[in-house]
From Swiss-Prot:
Organism: Haemophilus ducreyi (strain 35000HP / ATCC 700724)
PANTHER family given in the database record: ANAEROBIC GLYCEROL-3-PHOSPHATE DEHYDROGENASE SUBUNIT B (PTHR43400:SF11), FUMARATE REDUCTASE (PTHR43400)
Protein name, UniProt field: Anaerobic glycerol-3-phosphate dehydrogenase subunit B
Assembly with partners or alone: Composed of a catalytic GlpA/B dimer and of membrane bound GlpC.
Cofactor: FMN
InterPro entries the record matches: FAD-dep_OxRdtase_2_FAD-bd, FAD-oxidoreductase_2, FAD/NAD-bd_sf, G3P_DH_GlpB_su
Function: Conversion of glycerol 3-phosphate to dihydroxyacetone. Uses fumarate or nitrate as electron acceptor.
Biological-process GO terms, alphabetical: glycerol catabolic process
GO cellular component: glycerol-3-phosphate dehydrogenase (FAD) complex
MF (Gene Ontology): glycerol-3-phosphate dehydrogenase (quinone) activity
Entries under Pfam families matching the protein: FAD_binding_2
Amino acid sequence: MNFDVVIIGGGLAGLTCGIALQKQGKQCAIINNGQAAIDFSSGSMDLLSCLPSGQKVHVFCEAFSELSQQAPEHPYCLLGQHQVVAKVQQFEQFMQELGLVGSHKQNHLRVTPLGGLRHTWLSPKSVPVIAENEHFPYRQIAILGIEGYHDFQPQILVDNLKQNAAFSHCDFSIGYLNIPELDYLRQNAREFRSVNIAQLLEHKLAFEDLVQEIKQAAGNAQAVFLLACFGLDDQRFFDSLKQATALALFELPTLPPSLIGIRQYRTLRDQFEKLGGLLLNGDRAVRAEFDGDRVARIFTTLHQEESINAAHFVLASGSFFSNGLVAEFERVKEPIFDLDIIGNKAFINSERVSWTDKRFAAAQPYQSAGVAINHHCQVYKNGHLIPNLYAIGNVIGGFWGIEQGCASGVSVVTALTVAEWVGGTK
C-alpha cells in the first residue's frame, strides 16, 4: 500500500494533521489502535494554563517569553512564538466545526464536575464557562443529577461552587431526573455510564416526557447544569432539549469515557474520511525499514508481510497512556523507531532514579519524557535527523501536558506545523 503520508495514531494530533493534509491534496492513511485519549477528555482544550514555576497563565502571548526562559525544551519554544500563534489562529478558525468557543488572547475558566474552575483555551459551547474576573451570568441555578447515577454528586458541586467568587451571587437548587427508560441500566451499576445512557436515550426516549421532567425539576431556575449524557454523536439532541425547555442548559463532563470527548473524536474522524483519508482501525505499527537515513516502509500487526509505504511518516502515537512510549527497567523507549528521548531538566533517561520526584503530588520527571524534535517536528535517532519522520502531540518530550495545561495545544500546533511543512515539501 502506497500513500503520500502515513500517520501513526488517530487521536487529536493525528486526525488534525490528517485533515489538514487531505485539504492540501495529500493522500493520507491513519493507523489507529484502540481508543484515543480524546475519548477520555473533558472536551475543553488547553493552550497553556500554567508555567513550570506554577504561575497561572491568563494571556498566552504575555507568558511566552517566561516559558522560554523556564522551559527552553518545551515544543512551543522550539517552534517559536510566531509559528505557535499562527497555528493556534488556524485551529481557532477550524474549531467552529467542533462547536468550541474561546480565544488564545485570553484564557477563560470552565466549571469542572466537582465545582472547581480551571483555566483553559477552548471549551464546548454547551459547557458553563466564565471570563476572568467576571460573575456567572445567571443567578438561579438548578443542578440536576440522574437517579441511580453515583459518579456525579450535585451536593459536592454546589458546595465547591459556592466557594468561588464567580458564583457567590448564585442561589442553587438540587434535583434528580428519573427517566424511566433508564430502569434497565439501573439494574447493573457497571452499565450505568454516560455512553450507555446516551445510547439508550437516543433510541428509546419519550422526548416530551424528558422535557417536562427537566422543566419540573428545574423549577424557577434560570440555568440548569446537567450531566453530559444527552446526544451520542453530536450536540443536536442536547440543542433540541435546550430549545424545547426554553432554559439555559449546560452540560458537565462525566468520568471517562467522556461523551463530549467522544463527540469531538467522531466529528474529526468523519471529516477526515469525508476528505478521502483512510483509517486503518484496530491495527498497530510494529516495525520500520529504512533506506539510508529515511523511513521507507512500516509493518503493522495486521500487515506483517505487506508493507505500508509513504513519502512521509508522522508519529502521533501519544505517551505512556496509549503505548506511544514504554518504560523499560533501564530506559524510556519509543517502541517503533527507537528514537532519541528527552525530558525536562531533571529527567535523565539512563538514570531511573531521576524519573520520579520524592513528592508524590509533584509533577513527575518521567511524565515530561518523549521524543526529541527540531523546529519542523522532525525527529532524531542516535543523534541523526530523520528527514521524513515527524512527531506530533504527546509523544514529544520536554513538557508536562497535564500540569502545565498545554497537551491539546501542543497536539494541534505540532500537527498543523507538520501539515504545513509536509504539504509544501515535494
